[in-house]
Amino acid sequence: MRLPRYARLLLALASGALLAFSFPNYNFPLFAWPAVGMLVLACFEERPAISLLYGFLHGVTFYLLSVPWIDTVMHQYGNVDPLTAAGILGLLSVTLAVFPAVFAWAIALVSRKLPPGKNALFACVLSPFLWVALEYARTYLILGGFPWNLTGYAATASLGLLQLAAITGIYGLSFLVAAYSSLVVYAILAGRQVVWKAALVTTGALILAGVGGKYLVPAAVPHHVANLVQTDFPQSAEYPANWTQVHMNELTQLERISVSAAQESGEHPSLVVWPEVPAPFSFQDPMFTQLAQQIARESGGDFLVGIVDWRKDATGKWQASNTAVLLDSSGQRTFTYDKTHLVPFGEFVPYRRWLTFAGKLTADIGDFTPGSSFNVGKLPGGKFGVFICYEAIFPAEVREFTLHGAQLLINISNDGWFGRSAAPAQHLMMARVRAVENRRWLLRDTNNGFTASVDPYGRIVSEIPTDVRTELSAPYDFRQGLTPYVRFGDWFARLCILASFAFIILAFAQRQPQAAGKRKGSKSNG
């Protein structure tokens, strides 16, 4: 199929836009299913250098439309002017667009190196494997990785399809979306009736699984109730030293909410959870320490709370950690977890030596020191693992808690920094998949939303509205057993990496010089 360049360019831009529109707050998940194939079609038999541009523009479009809230965070809370904030969003979009650019370049290269007939098959078979391989690379490369809004999350709108994540992780769902899209493109390129029939049958099977699959997903019966307190503190770029004293009336209100909810829950001992530091909470603050211990004692159970934990290192220098702490019913500290995966430009400044301007972004909190272990805590009914905010988007890291014996997952987060943007809904969408991958109940407590209880199959069992100071009586249970994903990790994503290399090598091995020579001499479409 020969398309003019303007049509190819429009396909590339539209594919990026459709992929972005499949996520909150646009909420058109079906738009993701044709997106990858549209980019394949744009690059098929095109010059690799030009396809590199198509992929790059696809990526820039996708990020500008799907994570525009980065501009809001940087401007309102990062102490930077609007122009610099917009520049940071643009720089992130340009940097991450490298991954779809590589995808587009490879598809074009394979389709031009092989003779007609074979090239369409190879390009479309390679497509889902390479797409997943590059999403996996995005999870770890560049600033510690940014696997936000991976393609597979669009498929999680279907409870039935979502269950695949327990075997392959989120990457299997990305593969499913990309593979279907590529099959349809192959039907278009091949023009053969048998391929169209295969595409139609696949479409029917996906609709059946997507719509009817939820009826086959078993129920999960909870036996416990936790009290998740949504603190709803407004975010500020600066916090005065007397913040606790100034806000003591609000803290006392939260204490009443926490204690009364625990006493009324009928759960003995109870579990009260507060989110990731919504304000400058620290046990170096005597007033806050007294308040936290009082909540634990009066609730008659355990109290999990996010704090800034200050400690001296070997040289005597004070260092801060983003920490979750568990207090027992006597007010004693029984468990500590330090956040291991920090937010670049939010909790630390990468490449500080070169990016001197970025120090302003963490001026209000200083750099955090990352934790070094995925330790689990103990509750009367079993063991739990708690991951903090940004860590929810990294499947392999959450998996570590289950491997270390966690029977319950707890995610505490402060999404107040995102304002009323799409980010909190996107964050919940991704955290929900961690419950399925690990087959564990997930308790998610946030400062201003979305606070929810998610069962091991991805159902949101209970939640409360955003921007409200209240508590959620959240059902949960402790679960045993390990899913294939927990046992074997990112095996599917790594398989896609190997398959991508294998298909590219095979494509070059299949090359017919005379066909390649003819195409090389042919006139470029335009």
Describe each region flagged by the PLM:
Residues 213-345, 376-380, 386, 390-392, ...:
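Soluble catalytic regions of membrane-associated enzymes that act on cell-envelope
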